[in-house]
Amino acid sequence: MIAMNTPDFQRMKKDNKKISMVTCYDYWSACIISQSNVDCILVGDSLAMVMYGHSTTLPATVEIMAQHIQAVSRGAPNKFIIGDMPFCSYRKDLTTSMNAVERLMQAGAQAIKLEGADAHNLKFIHHVVKSGIPVIGHLGLTPQSIYTLGGFKVQGKEPSAAKKLMADAKALAETGCFAVVLECVPSELAELITHSISIPTIGIGAGPATSGQVLVLQDLLGTNNQFQPKYLKKFLNGFELIKKALDDFDQEVKTSTYPHLETHCY
């Protein structure tokens, strides 16, 4: 049984209880998260970068997303799972876009997330919500628009940009989103948005005042020693710990210490 549902997001904001979200892509790590206190899981299109080594999220497809959602849902059947709508999957005709939503939901998602709040997106979100499917919005640094934004940069610094982000957040709430991700926006702006809309905000690089926080699992575990954006706290030195385990294995194999005849052999 899933421990969390969409009304819980609203309740937690009302009760001033922070929401924890982790981005996860595979079965084995989902199994670990399923035993943790983390509230919910995002299967993000960032898997194109983290799992496949691409430089952007754009190569993620609906089918790739569905496969990873299936794996995560099998590993963490007790967690609320959000599936990312990948690049351009919701910018096509309504039937094609809804087929993409259907694929992700049938793969095991309980909600979908999509980036931006232009007129096209708002109309589509309205249709999806009216179809009984929960939607999370995503504002600020929207990686699918990376070439338009000019890189991975903080958004909303200028007054006009901040005003637009506020208007977009209000529009997403009014259209029926049950939460919105705020990525790489000034903390004061994120706080103002959080207090100005009825739905929870989930921050990544958006300061402490948002309704919750999301980090990629591999990032918070510190598995990439080359990746250190300002917003990231590494809760584990995973790179060094994993490397040491591999080196210890290598040494024990080469010195015939492993496998031990009495302990590891049949």
Swiss-Prot record:
It is an enzyme of class 2 (transferase). Keywords: Cytoplasm, Magnesium, Metal-binding, Pantothenate biosynthesis, Transferase. Belongs to the PanB family. Mg(2+) binds at residues 45, 84, 115. It catalyses: 3-methyl-2-oxobutanoate + (6R)-5,10-methylene-5,6,7,8-tetrahydrofolate + H2O = 2-dehydropantoate + (6S)-5,6,7,8-tetrahydrofolate. It comes from Coxiella burnetii (strain RSA 493 / Nine Mile phase I). Homodecamer; pentamer of dimers. One of its GO terms (biological process) is pantothenate biosynthetic process. Catalyzes the reversible reaction in which hydroxymethyl group from 5,10-methylenetetrahydrofolate is transferred onto alpha-ketoisovalerate to form ketopantoate. HAMAP family: PanB. SUPFAM superfamilies: Phosphoenolpyruvate/pyruvate domain. Binds 1 Mg(2+) ion per subunit. One of its GO terms (cellular component) is cytoplasm. GO terms for molecular function: 3-methyl-2-oxobutanoate hydroxymethyltransferase activity; magnesium ion binding. Its EC number is 2.1.2.11. Pathway: Cofactor biosynthesis; (R)-pantothenate biosynthesis; (R)-pantoate from 3-methyl-2-oxobutanoate: step 1/2. Signal peptide: none annotated. 3-methyl-2-oxobutanoate binds at residues 45-46, 84, 113. InterPro entries: Pantoate_hydroxy_MeTrfase, Pyrv/PenolPyrv_kinase-like_dom, Pyrv_kinase-like_dom_sf. It is found in: Cytoplasm. This is 3-methyl-2-oxobutanoate hydroxymethyltransferase. Its cofactor is Mg(2+). Its main location: cytoplasm.
